[in-house]
């Protein structure tokens, strides 16, 4: 009966059955493995140590960007499956060097770091856009589709009917409405906007550096996540102005450049790989975080929320698949 309740329409019945069975098996594993003495229960480190090269994937150079700061490099993976218009526009902005010389203008404690054109409100001084667009229609959510992978967490969520992971990104979905969307976990990247839903386009971007502000879900277009270098953003001095904006120009952090990795010589790239989220090993990883088996832990929660399952990233060890 539990599986039957998961059906939401006949056209998606097959993938819903498989999804429900996977969650059911994870839940059964949690019950059967509740005893610390269970030899089959693995720690997070043990799960990762058992991974094979096929459990990892290389980054797509065309959908990865580098934010270059004086302090170092921030690697951001883009999410064209969820925000194709914004991803294309951010890449267009990067390729016309729009971001070069702009600045991080906001660092709000336990919330976000944001970069933009400090002179955006001054017609004579604001940065010119050549071929990219200043604004776009919102991409707050997208339609469910059989070709979009989704590994569902078994423990429910407060903000959405279902949450899980899609190609490494934390996501949510509603089978009744047939919609899915990215969620605001630590390190997620979004496009700033004004009050109108279509007033953003990627010229202003922010990164979550605090407790997950899930109330922003489906109110802002999320278009990627930071894979490496988040500490360069989260450790910035906080802005003293309203909402954490820097009040003095000298407080801002200059942006050296934002580049699409495909445009950068291979010898200058940060060669990383990300744990796939559509494998049995990732299901094991979820279970190892739902019930922590490390010796330090004396109590297993038996559940997990979406933003407490970080997807591992490492320097590439396997032979990359050409992309």
List where the protein language model places each region.
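Bacterial N-terminal signal peptides
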Residues: 19-29
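Bacterial N-terminal signal peptides that target proteins for export
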Residues: 7-21
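Cyclophilin-like peptidyl-prolyl cis-trans isomerases
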Residues: 9, 33-323
């Amino acid at each position: 009966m539990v599986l039957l309740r998961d059906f939401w329409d006949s056209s998606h019945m097959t993938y819903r059955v498989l999804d429900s069975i996977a969650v059911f098996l994870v839940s059964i594993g949690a019950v059967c493995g509740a005893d610390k003495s269970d030899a089959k229960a693995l720690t997070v480190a043990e799960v990762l140590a058992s991974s094979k090269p096929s459990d990892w994937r290389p980054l797509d150079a065309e959908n990865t960007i580098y934010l270059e700061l004086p302090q170092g490099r921030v690697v951001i993976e883009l999410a064209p499956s969820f925000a194709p218009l914004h991803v294309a526009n951010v890449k267009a902005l990067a390729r016309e060097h729009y971001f070069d010389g702009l600045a991080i203008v906001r660092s709000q404690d336990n919330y976000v770091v944001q970069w933009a054109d400090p002179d955006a409100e001054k017609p004579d001084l604001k940065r010119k856009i050549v071929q990219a667009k200043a604004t776009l229609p919102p991409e707050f959510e997208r339609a469910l589709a059989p070709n979009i992978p989704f590994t569902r967490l078994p423990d429910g969520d407060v903000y959405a009917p279902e949450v899980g992971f899609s190609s490494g990104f934390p996501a949510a979905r509603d089978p009744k409405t047939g919609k899915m969307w990215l969620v605001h976990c630590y390190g997620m990247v979004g496009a700033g906007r004004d009050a109108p839903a279509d007033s953003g386009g990627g010229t202003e971007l922010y990164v979550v550096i605090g407790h997950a502000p899930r109330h922003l879900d489906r109110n802002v277009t999320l278009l990627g996540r930071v894979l490496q270098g988040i500490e360069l953003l989260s450790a910035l001095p906080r802005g003293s102005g309203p909402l954490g904006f820097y009040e003095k120009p000298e407080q801002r952090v200059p942006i050296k450049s934002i580049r699409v990795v495909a445009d950068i010589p291979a010898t200058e790239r940060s060669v990383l790989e990300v744990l796939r989220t559509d494998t049995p090993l990732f299901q094991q990883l979820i279970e190892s975080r739902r019930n922590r088996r490390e010796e330090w832990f004396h109590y297993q929660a038996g559940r997990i929320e979406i933003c407490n399952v970080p997807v591992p990233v490492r320097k590439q060890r396997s032979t990359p698949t050409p992309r």
